[in-house]
Amino acid sequence: MCSLFGLIDFKECLSTHTKNKILNTLARECQVRGTDATGIAYSFNGRLRIYKRPLPARKMKIHIPHGVNVVMGHTRMTTQGNAQINQNNHPFLGHADGSSYAPCQGL
């Protein structure tokens, strides 16, 4: 079992500090459904950024840079593959028609 979380701030109402606080709280709350790995994906300066580690959310500090307004996150409970091998953890980078994206696997 895993969990997804995210944040959208299109009107740019939230400070970067507040966004980071919200994301870390959401990740920790989602940890009950995935304790083996935690990751986020976001767009920054026109590039997709992925930050993930084989750690439970309570041990990982999520920090996004100023100007990021959309973030998708994932906490993982390992059912296949080894969570200690970080390439097995979400989000994954994918490509379609020359565009980069972080696909949702298994939906």
Region annotations inferred by a language model:
Residues 1-106:
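N-terminal glutamine amidotransferase
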